[in-house]
């Protein structure tokens, strides 16, 4: 059987060879739970541009990830985004490890405080859907428990947690690891967040761009956690744009050959992926069924939503929303 489509809508099934559709794939629309921007803008300074950039590459549902800022700036950003065409907001900071802060300003990091978190949630009026915490920080476990009780997805990451601290975070309600194998001890390290994450039932965000995770590590991760991977972009503003100088928060970023790094360093500063890129990369590495799982089904499970609410068609890297 084949699919027949008209005016970008599926209108029936037909015999193979009779289809008027020339699409390579028809799949559930992509869900990106970790993305900062695109099209030369961040969600915080050009939400419509960032949203449309990723929508044009097949992303049906987006969560806007915010890097570490001072609290007043963070509140202003939350207010500016809570009524945009987004599923919600992900606070990637400020409750993360200084050792593994990556492209977050180390001078703005904070320890988790439930009263402070309650204030941020109040400002968001239901728009904050996810928060990343380093579980080894003082107050982190109590914060994880509180957030989970409010229905907020808790991710652990940017972290130097040991095995015991990771297990306690899982028990408190953490369900996701933020960009696994980045900004934490690498796989193979004993008594680490990575060791427990591979063995446990956490969903593992993975940036498959050829730079964030070495090929050998990718295959090891996929073999040990084949059904728990979540494709993300972690896209920064340069996605869909040319190489050059950019910013993440107050930090300077240089993009060269589509690879973003903090200027003058080898520290990666997000990616320039779209979810279409991620889908095609996973399709090449592990196959079609798992690529669909990682780009649509697993992120939908994390968010507790229907992964089949919208479909896209792909032909020669061009996406049509069905």
Each PLM stretch: what is its role?
Residues 29-31, 155, 231-232:
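Residue-level marker for buried hydrophobic side chains located in beta-strands
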Residues 36-40, 48-77, 85-97, 124-136, ...:
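Divalent metal-dependent hydrolysis catalytic cores, especially in the metallo-beta-lactamase
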Residues 51, 75-82, 117, 144, ...:
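Generic structural signal for well-ordered alpha-helices
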Residues 91, 99-192:
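Divalent metal-binding pocket/active-site signature
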Residues 165-290, 295, 302-306:
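Active-site-adjacent C-terminal substructures of enzyme catalytic domains
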Residues 301, 306-322:
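C-terminal cap of metal-dependent C-N hydrolases
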């Amino acid at each position: 059987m084949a699919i027949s489509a008209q005016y970008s809508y599926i209108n029936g099934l037909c015999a193979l060879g009779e289809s008027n559709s020339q699409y390579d794939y028809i799949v559930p629309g992509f869900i990106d739970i970790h993305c900062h921007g695109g099209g030369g803008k961040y969600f915080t300074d050009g939400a419509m541009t960032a949203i449309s950039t990723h929508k044009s590459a097949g992303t049906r549902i987006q969560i806007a990830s915010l890097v570490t800022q001072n609290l007043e700036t963070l509140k202003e950003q939350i207010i500016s985004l809570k009524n945009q065409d987004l599923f919600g907001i992900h606070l990637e900071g400020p409750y993360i490890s200084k050792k593994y802060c990556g492209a977050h300003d180390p001078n703005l990091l904070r320890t988790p405080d439930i009263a402070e978190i309650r204030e941020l949630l109040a400002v968001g009026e239901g728009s904050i859907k996810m928060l990343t915490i380093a579980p080894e920080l003082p107050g982190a476990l109590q914060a994880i428990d509180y957030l989970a009780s409010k229905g907020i997805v808790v991710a652990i990451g940017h972290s130097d947690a040991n095995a015991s601290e990771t297990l306690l975070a899982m028990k408190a309600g953490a369900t996701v690891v933020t960009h696994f194998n980045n900004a934490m001890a690498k796989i193979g390290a004993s008594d680490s967040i990575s060791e427990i994450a591979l063995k446990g039932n956490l969903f593992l965000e993975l940036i498959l761009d050829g730079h964030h995770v070495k090929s050998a590590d990718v295959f090891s991760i996929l073999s040990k956690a084949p059904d728990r991977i979540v494709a993300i972009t972690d896209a920064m503003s340069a996605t869909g744009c040319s190489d050059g100088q950019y910013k993440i928060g107050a930090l300077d970023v240089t993009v060269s050959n589509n690879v973003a790094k903090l200027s003058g360093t080898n520290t990666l500063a997000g990616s320039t992926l779209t979810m279409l890129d991620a889908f095609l990369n996973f399709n090449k590495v592990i196959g079609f069924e798992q690529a669909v799982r990682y780009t649509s089904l697993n992120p939908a499970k994390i968010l507790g939503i229907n992964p089949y609410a919208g479909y896209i068609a792909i032909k020669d890297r061009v996406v049509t929303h069905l």
